[in-house]
Amino acid sequence: MTVKTRFAPSPTGYLHVGGARTALYSWLYAKSQGGEFVLRIEDTDLERSTQAAVDAIIEGMTWLGLEWDEGPYYQTKRFDRYNQVIDQLLAEGKAYKCYAPKELLDEIRAEQEANKEMPRYDANHPKIKAVNDAAKEGEPCCIRFRNPKEGSVVFDDQIRGRIEIRNDQLDDLIIRRTDGTPTYNFCVVVDDVDMGISHVIRGEDHINNTPRQINIYKAMGATIPTFAHCAMILGDDGAKLSKRHGAVSVMQYRDDGYLPEALLNYLVRLGWGHGDQEIFSRDEMINLFSLNAISKSASAFNTDKLLWLNNHYIKTSEPEYVAKHLEWHFENQGINKATGPALAEVVKLVGERCNTLVELAQQSRYFYEDFAEFDADAAKKHLRGVAKEPLMLALSKIEALTEWNTEALHHVIAQVCEELEIGMGKIGMPLRVAVTGGGQSPSVDAVMNLIGQERVIARIKMALEYIETREANA
């Protein structure tokens, strides 16, 4: 059997982390089994579905690198096929027309609730039967699936084990609305049959749909796929993950400076694991992934853990790869990458100090842009009269350099310390503030090397002017 999985989001909003984890698990299982992964857009909710949401889902999947082998398929383009199956079910007596108006169904539901009965549709209810018997062909009606009344639906969930639901607990599902549009639970089954889906991996909120869908598979004479229902993701407070917990959209994590590898690594561990291993490459995920290793219990989202992973991937990924993702943040922060060193060189120097690419872009700005003033606290502490002589000596030596590299600049600093008989801090910190505008940066010789000789000279002169002005105003 060829394994074929699918991710089938409804385009009523962005791709959230719960959906992304479901997509990841489906993608991983297909890849781990040498199978195929299908992307299907379930857009039968015409009122709520939007093209913007479709675009956001595809953008999120693409950013995560979850490439699909087939699709994207759109349910709204398959209405003829759904109607064909509905007509077949009607002809076989496995579906029927229901003329009961919504008002009557609401009235019956209220009566059932008042009598402490489970609210459900009953085709044999006297009021419903009377309406259906009196109806004439051509009057508005919906189509309902004739659910079996005897026996049970039993399936072996790959995560939760054996699940059994009695058929008398299930009512006759609407499969086509009065307006002629087919419904979600029906379309899903037809799609999975037509597309040859072997494994349905989805959230636990779909468990109640599964027995209803299995009965439709049986009515169609189709092979029933294997099901796996994943537990929900909770916020760090134990409540269901929602907007109030911060970013829940996949692309919001991109905007906040996360690498896709970090988010994928974090999501795969939200419910699945392999021993005590925390870091997984994409290939390791594929080779090690299994459905029966997914936990039945809900997982709590921990932003600190995600930040730790992101820092790991910024530090250990190829600098050119990190630089490719950093470009977006440079553009977003209005930094022109053409006015300074190669981004990959900056990543090598600054990357390990940053948890996100947003921080990395912010901390790299001085490589590409001159600043009008120094950080007030750093300048007050380090750009004082005592720093004037070391800076002037460093400036003269830097101006005289014919080779520009980190080693030569390190030698300049060492010479200043030796000639003036001062410690490294007496020149290192004033130089750092002079060339970066602030008090924190990687090794100042490496920083100056990337900034470039012309800019370094201009900035040291600016620092000396600052000191002179400060002394004059003292």
Swiss-Prot record:
<keyword id="KW-0648">Protein biosynthesis</keyword>
<dbReference type="InterPro" id="IPR049940">
    <property type="entry name" value="GluQ/Sye"/>
</dbReference>
<dbReference type="InterPro" id="IPR004527">
    <property type="entry name" value="Glu-tRNA-ligase_bac/mito"/>
</dbReference>
<comment type="subunit">
    <text>Monomer.</text>
</comment>
<dbReference type="InterPro" id="IPR008925">
    <property type="entry name" value="aa_tRNA-synth_I_cd-bd_sf"/>
</dbReference>
<dbReference type="InterPro" id="IPR033910">
    <property type="entry name" value="GluRS_core"/>
</dbReference>
<dbReference type="GO" id="GO:0005524">
    <property type="term" value="F:ATP binding"/>
</dbReference>
<dbReference type="GO" id="GO:0000049">
    <property type="term" value="F:tRNA binding"/>
</dbReference>
<dbReference type="GO" id="GO:0005829">
    <property type="term" value="C:cytosol"/>
</dbReference>
<keyword id="KW-0963">Cytoplasm</keyword>
<dbReference type="InterPro" id="IPR020058">
    <property type="entry name" value="Glu/Gln-tRNA-synth_Ib_cat-dom"/>
</dbReference>
<feature type="short sequence motif" description="'HIGH' region">
    <location>
        <begin position="9"/>
        <end position="19"/>
    </location>
</feature>
<dbReference type="InterPro" id="IPR001412">
    <property type="entry name" value="aa-tRNA-synth_I_CS"/>
</dbReference>
<dbReference type="InterPro" id="IPR014729">
    <property type="entry name" value="Rossmann-like_a/b/a_fold"/>
</dbReference>
<dbReference type="Pfam" id="PF19269">
    <property type="entry name" value="Anticodon_2"/>
</dbReference>
<dbReference type="InterPro" id="IPR000924">
    <property type="entry name" value="Glu/Gln-tRNA-synth"/>
</dbReference>
<feature type="short sequence motif" description="'KMSKS' region">
    <location>
        <begin position="240"/>
        <end position="244"/>
    </location>
</feature>
<dbReference type="GO" id="GO:0004818">
    <property type="term" value="F:glutamate-tRNA ligase activity"/>
</dbReference>
<comment type="similarity">
    <text>Belongs to the class-I aminoacyl-tRNA synthetase family. Glutamate--tRNA ligase type 1 subfamily.</text>
</comment>
<dbReference type="GO" id="GO:0008270">
    <property type="term" value="F:zinc ion binding"/>
</dbReference>
<keyword id="KW-0067">ATP-binding</keyword>
<dbReference type="InterPro" id="IPR020751">
    <property type="entry name" value="aa-tRNA-synth_I_codon-bd_sub2"/>
</dbReference>
<dbReference type="GO" id="GO:0006424">
    <property type="term" value="P:glutamyl-tRNA aminoacylation"/>
</dbReference>
<feature type="binding site">
    <location>
        <position position="243"/>
    </location>
    <ligand>
        <name>ATP</name>
    </ligand>
</feature>
<keyword id="KW-0547">Nucleotide-binding</keyword>
<keyword id="KW-0436">Ligase</keyword>
<comment type="function">
    <text>Catalyzes the attachment of glutamate to tRNA(Glu) in a two-step reaction: glutamate is first activated by ATP to form Glu-AMP and then transferred to the acceptor end of tRNA(Glu).</text>
</comment>
<dbReference type="Pfam" id="PF00749">
    <property type="entry name" value="tRNA-synt_1c"/>
</dbReference>
<dbReference type="InterPro" id="IPR045462">
    <property type="entry name" value="aa-tRNA-synth_I_cd-bd"/>
</dbReference>
<keyword id="KW-0030">Aminoacyl-tRNA synthetase</keyword>
<protein>
    <recommendedName>
        <fullName>Glutamate--tRNA ligase</fullName>
        <ecNumber>6.1.1.17</ecNumber>
    </recommendedName>
</protein>
